[in-house]
């Protein structure tokens, strides 16, 4: 991955954001892939929140193309590392869309969704909502992909953890 800082300095997130509404799936997933790289540093996550990127990414979770869903979920996962990102995703009703992706046929979609949900479970309101979807997360612990099964176990521990 190239250094994202020069891209952030020239406002790449804001410049790429409008392209997320393109009609061509190849454009959307490639833009989302670039946005993931830009949201790795903390400053990129903050910029994404400040410009309302979550609002444009959540609808992509329902896209027909698996790469669009995969990369949209990865960007949301990256943004949800920070508290502001968690609440932006919760406010845009992203939690329910991510839960629905736990049953997706594409392993990368399931993995990114469960990792994003794990981060949302760190917020009290996210944890509360995820308790209602614990069965879906528990089912994923039996996934044939060991990485996904392990991520689901981590999500379940995070959701059910009590202080």
Protein language model features and the residues they cover:
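Long amphipathic alpha-helical tracts in eukaryotic proteins
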Residues: 1-163
């Amino acid at each position: 991955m190239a250094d994202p800082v020069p891209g952030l300095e020239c406002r790449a997130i804001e410049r790429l954001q409008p392209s997320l509404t393109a009609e061509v799936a190849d454009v959307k997933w490639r833009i989302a892939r670039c946005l993931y790289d830009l949201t790795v540093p903390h400053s990129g996550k903050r910029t994404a929140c400040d410009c309302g990127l979550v609002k444009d990414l959540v609808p992509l979770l329902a896209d027909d193309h698996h790469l669009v869903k995969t990369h949209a979920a990865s960007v949301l996962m990256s943004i949800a590392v920070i508290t502001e990102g968690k609440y932006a995703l919760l406010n845009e009703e992203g939690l329910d869309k991510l839960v629905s992706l736990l049953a997706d046929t594409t392993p990368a979609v399931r993995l990114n969704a469960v990792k994003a949900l794990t981060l949302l479970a760190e917020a009290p309101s996210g944890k509360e909502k995820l308790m209602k979807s614990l069965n879906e997360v528990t089912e994923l612990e039996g996934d044939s992909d060991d990485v996904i099964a392990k991520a689901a176990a981590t999500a379940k521990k995070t959701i059910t953890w009590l202080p």
